Structure formats: structure tokens, C-alpha cells
């Protein structure tokens, strides 16, 4: 957990530094991200710290495309700067594609993601705001114990996530798909929120 906090702290320092250097909206240079896009700042920051990048073939960011649970694990591994290359064998889920096994394995080994309880991860399922927030909040040190979920997974995530600002500008629906723009926004919200400190 200490290493995750260190990685998040370093990423946050990078974000703060970049925040001072961003000249104006649209600097990310994605042709499909308008200057007035609600998530343009988050997209720029996440691109600059190499957490989320655009489509190599088209040069687009695709801010309105839904994100899968597998893609969210990639975002989390990049956000936390996990050395994912060594974690392919740590992925216990049979439905995760070969290319993504190191990312999901690294997140699983660091208690950021969990599966559905039937041996699957739901690799191609769209991620919801509550699921994504749970991953972000575990990385921040929340939900380390089963009693943290005593009111149920969704209730606990929405309550704590709302309190620390994870859902700001996104909403906390448990049943809608998140877009790439919203994931960027939530990641930036997480980087700007408080981490749990244990004494």
C-alpha cells in the first residue's frame, strides 16, 4: 500500500506541475476533443502523464467511447506506475485477453480490482462510475477491509466517493457506461483528492 501511495504522490506532483504549464484548452491536440469539452483539462493531464493516450491509427482520443473493465485496469496500472510486465501470471481470470493479463494481474495483486466471483473479470463489460470509483478509491487507501463495505459495495462507494469528490462532474450512476472522457475526469478527481493515511 505504501508503494501505491508513493506512486500516486509522484503522479499528483506531476499533475500539479503540469497544471502550472498548461497554456490553454485543446493543447492535447486531439482533433476530436473540442476546446469546450467538459473533460478537456483532464484529458490533457492524463495524456501528459502518459496514463491515457489517443488512438495511434486515427490520432483521436475518442472521448465519448465506452471503457471496458479491461481498459480501466490499464488506466489504473498506468496511473499507479505499476511494473505490470511481471504480473501476467498473477491474473486469475480466464476471460482476460492475453495482451491485458499483465495489467489486470498487477491491479489484482495490488488489490485494485476484483472479479465477479465465478472466475471471470468481466473483461469486455463496460465499466460503471461506481466500479471505476471503487478502483480509484482502493488505490487511494480506502476500502481495505471487508467491514468498509458493511452497507453494500455501491452504497459505500457512492457515499465515500461523493465525500472526497471522485464523482465531481461525472455522476455516480451504478448502471451507466463510463466514457473515456469521464474516466480521465475521474482519474484527475482522484489525483486531486485526499489519500487515506494510517497511523
Where in the sequence are the language-model features?
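Feature responds to low-complexity, polar/acidic, surface-exposed segments characteristic
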Residues: 2-40, 52-102, 110-131, 136-177, ...
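PEST-like intrinsically disordered low-complexity regions enriched in serine, proline, threonine
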Residues: 45-46, 107
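Conserved dinucleotide-binding and phosphotransfer motif residues
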Residues: 49
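Extracellular, beta-strand-rich glycan-interacting domains
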Residues: 182, 187-191
Amino acid at each position: 500500500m505504501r508503494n501505491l501511495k508513493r506512486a500516486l504522490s509522484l503522479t499528483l506532483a506531476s499533475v500539479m506541475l503540469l497544471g502550472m504549464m498548461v497554456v490553454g484548452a485543446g493543447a492535447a491536440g486531439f482533433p476530436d476533443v473540442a476546446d469546450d469539452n467538459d473533460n478537456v483539462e483532464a484529458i490533457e493531464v492524463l495524456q501528459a502523464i502518459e496514463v491515457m493516450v489517443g488512438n495511434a491509427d486515427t490520432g483521436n482520443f475518442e472521448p465519448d467511447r465506452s471503457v471496458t473493465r479491461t481498459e480501466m485496469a490499464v488506466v489504473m496500472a498506468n496511473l499507479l506506475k505499476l511494473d505490470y510486465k511481471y504480473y501476467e501470471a498473477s491474473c486469475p481470470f480466464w476471460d482476460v485477453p492475453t495482451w491485458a493479463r499483465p495489467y489486470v494481474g498487477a491491479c489484482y495483486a495490488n488489490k485494485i480490482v476484483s472479479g465477479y466471483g465465478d472466475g471471470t473479470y468481466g473483461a469486455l463489460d463496460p465499466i460503471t462510475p461506481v466500479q471505476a470509483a471503487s478502483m480509484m478509491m482502493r488505490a487511494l487507501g480506502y476500502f481495505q477491509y471487508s467491514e468498509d463495505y458493511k452497507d453494500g459495495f455501491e452504497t459505500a462507494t457512492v457515499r465515500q466517493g461523493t465525500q472526497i469528490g471522485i464523482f465531481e462532474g461525472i455522476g455516480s450512476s451504478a448502471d451507466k457506461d463510463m466514457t473515456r472522457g469521464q474516466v480521465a475526469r475521474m482519474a484527475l478527481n482522484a489525483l486531486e483528492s485526499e489519500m487515506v493515511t494510517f497511523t
